């Protein structure tokens, strides 16, 4: 009522966090599992999609085994979000909260194609959910991309999150327009970089980063340059020294360069232009699954082309928001439960 009276929006995110923090601090578990169905489901990947699916399946009485390639669960919430956005080991607290409902086991160091086989899982479990995420990085496809001190933003952020000593340059250029580009830009400033330029080939309205994220970057001293695209990275065996750009515009609905070029000095370049699905993400699955445009093809219930195999999250939509991945997991869990003869999914 107070917010309404002052014509201010309700801060839904803060309200949700207040409620969740109270549950965590008081170790209250409001969910209760249904009676056991006797069914077993394998979930590949302990990110938002996988853990959402596992939680809903467990709530419905199914036994779930989660196979996670890394040493910790959480996916990009644990490894890919900037450190300044996360507090008090929140991702791991969330995982423990999910596990406390019961019926979920996580096996770490288990990756498709290495020590986990989709064919074997299909035989041992009643259903399988793929939430593998994306491990490949889009290439700039320009000269100099392989020079020292050209980094993938997500990998660099992962190093920071896992308390690895990460060197930060003084003059940094970030290529991209999404939230990850903002994350690495702001994180670099917080780590002591003198100048950080975020370069994006289109305008601010076309950026994947929200207005709030763009504003956050600018408040932290990040200079955002629009309508420029990278042409080449200059440097030598010791590292990067500069980056050449060309100004761009939209012509007949397509992005084109207009011939005007300029160079910006830098000692570090971060690529934040999205991740892609690569064969190793799916182990032995690519030969079996329907893949289109670098994504696993699913229907409205998150079913893949393989009977009994479902998928969700970044490997399906190419990488959007956490809430989308969580919703994928919920939808898949209901469909799996229904397929296995369950009710009230």
What annotation goes with each model-predicted range?
Residues 1-19, 65, 103-104:
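Iron-sulfur cluster-binding cysteine motifs and their immediate structural context
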Residues 6, 47-49, 72, 178-180, ...:
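Residue-level detector of alpha-helix initiation sites
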Residues 66, 70-100, 106-107, 160, ...:
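Rossmann-like dinucleotide-binding cores of NAD(P)H-dependent redox enzymes
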Residues 146-169, 252-319:
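FAD-site-proximal beta/loop scaffold in flavoenzymes
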Residues 184, 315-343:
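A conserved FAD-binding loop/helix module that cradles the flavin
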Residues 18-35, 96-109, 114, 137-191, ...:
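Glycine-rich dinucleotide-binding loop and its adjacent helix/turn
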Residues 39-65, 181-189:
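N-terminal Rossmann-like FAD-binding beta1-loop-alpha1 element of flavoenzymes
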Residues 35-36, 40-44, 92-142, 232-244, ...:
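Feature captures the FAD/FMN-dependent oxidoreductase FAD-binding
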